[in-house]
């Protein structure tokens, strides 16, 4: 029994080795046969290629092709291809005897009766005979260059025909593996696919329907050698490809057609009917041609997504319904085929020779399609349609497309989310607020904030923040954005991109701010919402890390001398808005409040001035009274070096940083370095807000501006030919002049520039340079504040020839506000008896000043409810009507800055102010800093139209909003 087991094992081992050797020998023989047959076919093909046809030197119109069918193991797919072949019919039978090389051993062990054991080993050599039969025959070719399968002779059996792949490469046509049928006397055919070590030695699959390679600019066609089934041959006609529909010119570059559904492939499903809710003749179902490889799809800009690659390979879940599939490719860029043609669908090619664009209801219906690529490309095409087209935006809202797009923001596929957000960005752009309200009503703001928290793709974050920036220009949406997105915008974007760290490492260098598009969009959004009102300002001030991060970003910009970009502009505007009414709204402001001046503060100041002027230095009692009341009414010590700032037990943070004297140097640096008009206006406005109010910190701010040599910077900016810069600087100087020392310096060195602006209001130096009413009123109010309680400043006004300019303005101005403000200044000048003699010598009579004063109402010097002004940044005028009308096929992503995301809103115009106070007098020379940059040249700063406050009976401080 034991001998039988040993014998059986040995036999099995020998049989296995025999089979291995047999197949090895068979392989060698087949390889030799391949070379032999390939050589014969190549020799037979050369005469036909040389001789041509009809003596014209051209190849024969009827090409000799071999239709090869590969039959693999059961369950494998068949592939069809065409290849050149010799002109003769060849039928061969090859018999190969295979020597395994290593003989098979049979071992037997026999034990005799005497106990001896005998081992016998027998070597057996087996020969395997394999018969390989090949049949090569001529296949007729039709006029379209394709094999005639219908009505032609049967293809016949296809026996073994695995030609050498080197021949296939030399043949000049597409290649495919041939079917093989091994007839062997022993052993089975090895299972598994054959090795494919060459990319050209591949077989095609009917069911996969993969994209063909980009063989040339037009892509592969039927003439490129790919076999087309007869039933779908009409979809790929031979000859020139159909061009774009009439009236549509070809795009000049790849970016010209970035969006839209693709229609250059079609499924081989049984039914070619349109998808649900679509017209039957709209051929958006994919037509699939056999693959000859896969080409590369270039893109105009980086367009990555988390799982965008999955969309490219997705197949419809319902094979029997030819759903309107879009081109399955990543990104919003169209196929390269779109550059030169648009292939018609099978259905529409029979009815309409041209491909038609989808209707808007069809595009919106695709947003509900079960196939994700359809949703993604429909949203991208919708974004393309909405670009600079207010009518389409309105129709999308009327057809209730906005809720569909908002719902796609929570889609599991990143590509769908990205394209839906891009469509919402375009739909929310513009002055029409109906779309913004519709997005709010369907929960668009919370959905965008959720997407921002979840997205890690930079482009998605740009789209989300850009959409929020658009929505933030709509007044009712500002608090909605604050409620749902303030924390996310701050902690996800502002803090990380600003370079600020809550716990900085002392050993490492502070990080610089990153001026990314995401940061620009987010800061623009916060810039808009910061102008909503007191509650919005309170929420932003108390948001942890926001003020710290914004100041760090501005310090980084000043350090790198990069102060002209939009991100810096947005940050300064936010700081200006948050500084508005800071003396009233911040927690604990009551502790720092100083005594409010009475309504007759100017008269009290005049009495104090006359009492102090009783002697050369003033009376002793007056000096002692002033010393003990040191900082009353905003006054400060004559010697600035003795001004003690509050002692700190810990570093300031959060909203406390808004009004610290240290920020003065930052704003002055921006005023010195920047050439951006909006940045200059915002920085001057921030100083204007901080120096307003009767509290201790305003006193410190006014003194710090003088100490940091900021007065020459502001005075020089009065020469700017940009209207809004002159206005902001004039109001800032008015607030700073509440400091007595500042008033004397400004009166001596700024009066000439102020008077020049008054003259320009009457006679502009050039066409279009006329100052606006608000600017003229601001300049006149500043002059009035300077000459009040200051005889020397009134003399400076006379020396600057200001009286003739004021009288002419009263007589000729069409503005009631300008005339009243000028009358108040003239009335104040005539009140100084010391100047009346000089005025009369110059030919001025009392009647001139009385007639001017008769037009003014109210007590002398009471130009407004207060003597200082604080405001927020005016709302940026988007000027959509002045935009360039670019191609509707290109969405200017970089051009959608604050001018593109903000809209004009004239509803918020609330004048604010408080009373003025005089200060002790002391004069010091105003020195210019030689190291400071000169102001930007005038011609580069055109006048900017600004929404102004509604005219009032009294001159009102400018109070405008972002």
Curated annotation (Swiss-Prot):
Residue ranges of the region described as Required for interaction with RNA-binding proteins DDX5, HNRNPH2 and SRSF1 and with mRNAs: 776-962
Biased composition regions of type Low complexity, renumbered to the chain: 206-217
First and last residues of every ARM repeat: 348-387, 390-429, 433-467, 468-508, 526-565, 575-622, 646-686, 699-738, 739-781, 782-826
Transmembrane found in the keyword field: no
Omega-N-methylarginine modification, residue list: 170
SUPFAM superfamilies, per the entry: ARM repeat (SSF48371)
Tissue specificity statement from the Swiss-Prot or TrEMBL entry: Found in all the examined tissues including heart, brain, liver and kidney. Found at low level in lung. Expressed in dermal connective tissue, salivary gland duct and in the corneal layer (at protein level). Expressed in arrector pili muscle (at protein level). High levels detected in epithelial cells with lower levels found in fibroblasts and T lymphocytes.
PTM annotation (Phosphoserine): residues: 267, 332, 335, 343, 345, 606, 864, 871, 915
Modified residues (Phosphothreonine): 102, 104, 642, 872
Main subcellular localisation: other
GO cellular component annotations of the record: adherens junction; cytoplasm; nucleus; plasma membrane
Chain positions covered by the region annotation Disordered: 95-122, 186-253, 266-290, 590-614, 854-962
Keywords: Cell adhesion, Cell junction, Coiled coil, Cytoplasm, Methylation, mRNA processing, mRNA splicing, Nucleus, Phosphoprotein, Repeat
Motif (Nuclear localization signal): 607-623
Polar residues: compositionally biased ranges: 102-114
Ranges of Acidic residues composition bias in the record: 270-280
MF (Gene Ontology): cadherin binding
SMART domains listed in its UniProt record: ARM
Pfam families for this protein: Arm (PF00514)
Quaternary state and interactors: Component of a ribonucleoprotein complex containing mRNAs and RNA-binding proteins including DDX5, HNRNPH2 and SRSF1 as well as ARVCF. Interacts (via the extreme C-terminus) with FRMPD2 (via the PDZ 2 domain). Interacts with CCDC85B.
Family statement: Belongs to the beta-catenin family.
General function of this protein: Contributes to the regulation of alternative splicing of pre-mRNAs.
Name the record gives this protein: Splicing regulator ARVCF
Organism: Homo sapiens (Human)
Gene: ARVCF
């Amino acid at each position: 029994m034991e001998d039988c087991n040993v014998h059986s094992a040995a036999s099995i081992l020998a049989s296995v080795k025999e089979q291995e050797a047999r197949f090895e020998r068979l392989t060698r023989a087949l390889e030799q046969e391949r070379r032999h047959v390939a050589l014969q076919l190549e020799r037979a093909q050369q005469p036909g290629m040389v001789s041509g046809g009809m003596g014209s030197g051209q190849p024969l119109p009827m090409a000799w092709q071999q239709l090869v069918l590969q039959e693999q193991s059961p369950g494998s797919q068949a592939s069809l291809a065409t290849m050149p072949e010799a002109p003769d019919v060849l039928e061969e039978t090859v018999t190969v005897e295979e020597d395994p090389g290593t003989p098979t051993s049979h071992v037997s062990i026999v034990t005799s009766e005497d106990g001896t054991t005998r081992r016998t080993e027998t070597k057996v050599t087996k020969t395997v005979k394999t018969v390989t039969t090949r049949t090569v025959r001529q296949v007729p070719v039709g006029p379209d260059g394709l094999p005639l399968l219908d009505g032609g002779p049967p293809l016949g059996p296809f026996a073994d025909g695995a030609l050498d792949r080197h021949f296939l490469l030399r043949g000049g046509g597409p290649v495919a593996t041939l079917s093989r049928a091994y007839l062997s006397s022993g052993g089975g055919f090895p299972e598994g696919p054959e090795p494919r070590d060459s990319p050209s030695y591949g077989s095609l699959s009917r069911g996969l329907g993969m994209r063909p390679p980009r063989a040339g600019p037009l892509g592969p066609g039927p003439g490129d050698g790919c076999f087309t089934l007869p039933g779908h041959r009409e979809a790929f006609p031979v000859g020139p490809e159909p061009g774009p529909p009439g009236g549509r010119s070809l795009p000049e570059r790849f970016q010209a057609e970035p969006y839209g559904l693709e229609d250059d492939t079609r499924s081989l499903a049984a039914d070619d009917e349109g998808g649900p809710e679509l017209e039957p003749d709209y051929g958006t179902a994919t037509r699939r041609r056999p693959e000859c490889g896969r080409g590369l799809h270039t893109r105009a800009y980086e367009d990555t997504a988390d799982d965008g690659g999955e969309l490219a390979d997705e197949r419809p879940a319902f094979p029997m319904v030819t759903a309107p599939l879009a081109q399955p490719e990543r990104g919003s860029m169209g196929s390269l085929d779109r550059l030169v043609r648009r292939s018609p669908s099978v259905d529409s090619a029979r009815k309409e020779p041209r491909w038609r664009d989808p209707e808007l209801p069809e595009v919106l219906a695709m947003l509900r399609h079960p196939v994700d690529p359809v949703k993604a490309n429909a949203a991208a095409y919708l974004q393309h349609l909405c670009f600079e087209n207010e009518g389409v935006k309105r129709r999308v809202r009327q057809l209730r497309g906005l809720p569909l797009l908002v719902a796609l923001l929570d889609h599991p596929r990143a590509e769908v989310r990205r394209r839906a957000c891009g469509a919402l960005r375009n739909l929310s752009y513009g002055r029409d607020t109906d779309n913004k309200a519709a997005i709010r009503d369907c929960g668009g703001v919370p959905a965008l904030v959720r997407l921002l928290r979840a997205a890690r793709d930079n482009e998605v974050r740009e789209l989300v923040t850009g959409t929020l920036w658009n929505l933030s220009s709509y007044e009712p949406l500002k608090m909605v954005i604050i409620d749902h997105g303030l924390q996310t915008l701050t902690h996800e974007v502002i803090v990380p991109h600003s370079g600020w760290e809550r716990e900085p490492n002392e050993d490492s260098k502070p990080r610089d701010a990153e001026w990314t598009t995401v940061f620009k969009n987010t800061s623009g959004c916060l810039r808009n919402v910061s102008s909503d009102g007191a509650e919005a300002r309170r929420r932003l001030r108390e948001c942890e890390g926001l003020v710290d991060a914004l100041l760090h970003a501005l310090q980084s910009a000043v350090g790198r001398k990069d102060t002209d970009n939009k991100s810096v502009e947005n940050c300064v505007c936010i700081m200006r808005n948050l500084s508005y009414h800071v003396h009233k709204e911040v927690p604990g402001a009551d502790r720092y409040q100083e005594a409010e001046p009475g309504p007759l503060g100017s008269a009290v100041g005049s009495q104090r001035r006359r009492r102090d002027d009783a002697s050369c230095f003033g009376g002793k009692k007056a000096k002692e009274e002033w010393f003990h009341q040191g900082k009353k009414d905003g006054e400060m010590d004559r010697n600035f070096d003795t001004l003690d700032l509050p002692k700190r037990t810990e570093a300031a943070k959060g909203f406390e940083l808004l009004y610290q004297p240290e920020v003065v140097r930052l704003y002055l640096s921006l005023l010195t370095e920047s050439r951006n008009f909006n940045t200059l206006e915002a920085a001057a406005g921030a100083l204007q807000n901080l120096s307003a109010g009767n509290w201790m910190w305003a006193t410190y701010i006014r003194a710090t501006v003088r100490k940091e040599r900021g007065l020459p910077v502001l005075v020089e900016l009065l020469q700017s030919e940009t209207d809004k810069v002159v206005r902001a600087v004039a109001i800032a100087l008015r607030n700073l002049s509440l400091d007595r020392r500042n008033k004397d310096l400004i009166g001596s060195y700024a009066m000439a520039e102020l008077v020049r602006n008054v003259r320009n209001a009457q006679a502009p130096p050039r066409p279009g340079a006329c100052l606006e009413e608000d600017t003229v009123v601001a300049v006149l109010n500043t002059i009035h504040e300077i000459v009040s309680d200051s005889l020397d400043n009134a003399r400076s006004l006379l020396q600057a020839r200001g009286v003739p300019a004021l009288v002419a303005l009263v007589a000729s101005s069409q503005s009631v506000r300008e005339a009243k403000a000028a009358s108040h200044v003239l009335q104040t000048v005539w009140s100084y008896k010391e100047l009346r003699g000089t005025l009369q010598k110059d030919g001025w009579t009392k009647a001139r000043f009385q007639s001017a004063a008769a037009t003014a109402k109210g007590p002398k010097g009471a130009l407004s409810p207060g003597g200082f002004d604080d405001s927020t940044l005016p709302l940026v005028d988007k000027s959509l009507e002045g935009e360039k009308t670019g191609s509707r096929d290109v969405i200017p992503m970089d051009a959608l800055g604050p001018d593109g995301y903000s809209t004009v809103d004239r509803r918020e115009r609330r004048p604010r102010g408080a009373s003025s106070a005089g200060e002790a007098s002391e004069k010091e020379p105003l020195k210019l800093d030689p190291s400071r940059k000169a102001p930007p040249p005038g011609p580069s700063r055109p006048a900017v139209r600004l929404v102004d406050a509604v005219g009032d009976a009294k001159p009102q401080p400018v109070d405008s909003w972002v």
